[in-house]
Each structure stands twice: as C-alpha cells, then as structure tokens.
Amino acid sequence: EPDFIAAWYSTFSDKRLGDVDFWHERSVGTYMALNSGCRGGSGTYQQTVADECQDILTLGMIFDVQDRAEALVAEIQGELDNISPYLADKDRLTVAVLEDEGGTYRVYGEDTLGGNVATSGGAELAVGKHGDNGNISAEDLIAANPDAIFMVWYNGYTVNDTDYAGEQVVELITENPAFASLDAVKNDRVFAINLNNVYCSGMRTLDGVLDFAQHLYPEL
C-alpha cells in the first residue's frame, strides 16, 4: 500500500503495475521519469542530462527536500562546467555506446540519454548520429572503428545464455577475433558501463558522465 510510486513509463503497463489511473483512484501519487518514454521514444524527444536534473528537482519538490535536490543538480552542473573548458581545444575521442543483443548491437545514439551522457563526458559519437539509433552489425562497428567502446550491462544481463553482467561484458568485444583490428581493442579502450548510469539515471547521472570522462581522459 504505497503512498507514492516513482517509476519508468513501462512500469505502468498492464502487465506490470497497471495504468496510473488505477493508483490515482486509490490516492496513490505517481511520477514517471521524463526519459523513460512518457513523452514518446528517443526519436520523438531527445533524452538529455537536463531532463534527469529536472526529475531530481521535481522529486525534491514532491518530497520537500528541494535543498538536497538543488545541491545534487549543482554538483552535476559543476562537473559539466569543469569538463567543457578542458575539451575546448582538444579533439574528442570517438565512441560507440553499445549493448550486445546476440548478433547485433543496440546503439545508444545522440537522441538517447546514453548518447547525451557520453557527449557530456567528452565523447564524439561514432555511431548513432542524426537520430539513427537502430541496431548495427559487427561489420558496421568495424567500419566505424571508434577510438573507444562502452558496453552496456545490467543485473541479469546475458548473451546466448552466458552471464555478462559486470566488467566481463567487455569480453564480448575484446575476445571476439572479428574485432581484433579495432583501435579500441588494440588500445585497451573497451569499457563496461552500467545501464543505471545511462538510462533514467537520476541520482546516478553524474556517475555516468564521469564514467566517460575519466575513462576517455584520465588526466582530466
């Protein structure tokens, strides 16, 4: 018997918690994360770090902890303000943010939060530009040849029934002979990143930005 539910748009589907009206009729408040699809897919609305900050501020108002919410958003903005001048006179490293779906690779492109977190952390996207967030093949990845690859994982993540939840997700790239020629492989720039840091990341948004910034520019 909750008083309030904060969740993704998909959480309020018929197969899960049901429509928000069901809860409102029972005096239960609800909030959907802006980047979870409640306004439409990433192809309709660009998902941004700014949206995550707005979620934090809105929830801060709902729970009457505005000062804490504002401090967290200020911390995120402060780190972004540190990263931008550092990169002003540098060529950004090209990056692919991918999720292995067993033969093809989901792209976290520029319209997705993952893509926006990556660029906020100093990446230049090698794939997923101009709203093209469709899956890519191994051949597409080889042709793009990014400087670095970030492989997305989450708890329970498997590929072909093998557990790749955690740092071992990089092996999907580094242990695949087809990718031996990739600059990211040759230069040890294949990294793991948790889905929580690149999708509806909320309070973990800064973790995501720093994941990219610190891996790509360790001297930062």
Residue spans for each PLM region:
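Internal, well-ordered alpha-helical scaffold/interface segments
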Residues: 57, 74, 112-119, 139
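Residue-level recognition of alpha-helix initiation/capping sites
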Residues: 13-15, 50, 109, 132, ...
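Short acidic/glycine-rich loop or secondary-structure boundary segments that cap or lie
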Residues: 103-107, 116, 158-160
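Alpha-helical, coiled-coil/dimerization segments enriched in small aliphatic residues
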Residues: 107-134
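Acidic/histidine-enriched, beta-strand-rich ligand/metal-binding domains
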Residues: 125-132, 140, 144, 148-149, ...
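Short, conserved, surface-exposed binding loops centered on an aromatic residue
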Residues: 85-90, 117, 140-144
